[in-house]
Amino acid sequence: MVKRRNHEVPKGLLKSWLGREGSKDGLHYIDLSTGALCFEEGREASFAITDYIYVPKRLNGERDDALEDWFAVDENGLAVFSQRAAAGTLASFTNEKLINQAIRACIALGNRSAYSMFMAITASGTADNSAHEFAVANILRSTGQKFKAFSTWEFLVLYNLPVPLLISERPFLDFTPRGHDMVLMALGPRSLMIGTPCDDPSRRQMSLRVGPAGPEHKRIARIHNRMSAEMARQWVVASSRSELAALADELTPEKVLARRQTDRVIFS
C-alpha cells in the first residue's frame, strides 16, 4: 500500500530532539510561515509530514512509490546511527551496511524537503501530474550524483558537543556549491557529522571516524546552527524553547520570505 504521510525528515532522527513542556514530552519548533514558537506533544513530528510528497500520480492514476521506498531503505540505518551518535556509543557500531545506509540517508536529506519539491514542481512549467513526476526524477538524479561525489569522503562524528544543535527540514548542509569542500549534519542535539574530501587519491570508499567533541568545536557547531537557520524555509527544531526564542528575531516570516526570493531550482 502506498504511504500517504511522508516525513521529509524521518521521525526516527527528530526524536533525538525530544524536549519537555511542563509534564509533556514532545518537540519544540518554530513554524517559519508564522514565526510562532510551537510545541508538539509526542514523537510523531506531524509538522514534518506532507501527504504524498514523494509518491506522485502516474498518468493511469496509480501512485509511483519508488522514491519513498528508496528513502525508506536507508532510513533504518540512519535511525540506528543517529541514536548511537546521540548516545555517544557510535564508536562501537561496526555494522558497515547500516553505516553506509545512514550516510546515504544523510546525503539524501539535502534534497528531499517539501519546500524543495514544491519549487521543482512549480519550476517544471507544467500543471498536470507530470510536474510532480519530474520533480521526483530530479531528486533521484541529483541525489545519485551526490552519492557519487561523496563516495570517497571522510566522515567524522563528534558527540558531547559544547553547543546544542538545531535541525531544520534541510538538515544536510552542503557547502560545496559555496566553494568549500565540507558537509555538516546534526545527528542529535549534541552530535554532529562532518564530511570532507579524503587526502588519499587512491581511496575507493568512504571512511568514518568517531570521537568526543572539545571546546575547540564550539565554532563548527555555531557555523552549523547559523547555516541551519539561514537555509530553513519551513521549520526549525531545537531541544528547548529557550534556544528557539533566541532565534526568533532572525526567523520572522518577512526575513524567511526574503531568503526564499533568492532560492533557485537546480536541475540535474
What positions do the PLM features span?
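Alpha-helical structural context detector biased toward long hydrophobic helices
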Residues: 1-268
